[in-house]
Curated annotation (Swiss-Prot):
<dbReference type="InterPro" id="IPR001705">
    <property type="entry name" value="Ribosomal_bL33"/>
</dbReference>
<dbReference type="InterPro" id="IPR011332">
    <property type="entry name" value="Ribosomal_zn-bd"/>
</dbReference>
<dbReference type="GO" id="GO:0006412">
    <property type="term" value="P:translation"/>
</dbReference>
<protein>
    <recommendedName>
        <fullName>Large ribosomal subunit protein bL33c</fullName>
    </recommendedName>
</protein>
<dbReference type="Pfam" id="PF00471">
    <property type="entry name" value="Ribosomal_L33"/>
</dbReference>
<dbReference type="GO" id="GO:0009507">
    <property type="term" value="C:chloroplast"/>
</dbReference>
<keyword id="KW-0150">Chloroplast</keyword>
<dbReference type="InterPro" id="IPR018264">
    <property type="entry name" value="Ribosomal_bL33_CS"/>
</dbReference>
<dbReference type="GO" id="GO:0005840">
    <property type="term" value="C:ribosome"/>
</dbReference>
<dbReference type="InterPro" id="IPR038584">
    <property type="entry name" value="Ribosomal_bL33_sf"/>
</dbReference>
<keyword id="KW-0687">Ribonucleoprotein</keyword>
<dbReference type="GO" id="GO:1990904">
    <property type="term" value="C:ribonucleoprotein complex"/>
</dbReference>
<comment type="similarity">
    <text>Belongs to the bacterial ribosomal protein bL33 family.</text>
</comment>
<keyword id="KW-0689">Ribosomal protein</keyword>
<dbReference type="GO" id="GO:0003735">
    <property type="term" value="F:structural constituent of ribosome"/>
</dbReference>
<keyword id="KW-0934">Plastid</keyword>
Length: 66
């Protein structure tokens, strides 16, 4: 049997430029991706470059809390 917490956890990645532009109401929404990460290999917050459908370009998507 496995000991402790699960190694793989589900995380949500959110567009950082949409969050900043949300104050100005320039974008129609906030782009989010759902993925998994291995807690032992990447203990820090994950940041990936993904396509944002609201900005129409590739931007940095950072991990957010659930």
């Amino acid at each position: 049997m496995a000991k402790g917490k699960d190694v793989r956890v589900t995380i949500i990645l959110e567009c950082t430029s949409c969050v900043r532009n949300d104050i100005k109401k320039e974008s129609a929404g906030i782009s989010r991706y759902i993925t998994q990460k291995n807690r032992h290999n990447t203990p820090s917050r994950l940041e990936l470059r993904k396509f944002c459908a609201y900005c129409y370009k590739h931007t940095i998507h950072g991990e957010i809390k659930k």
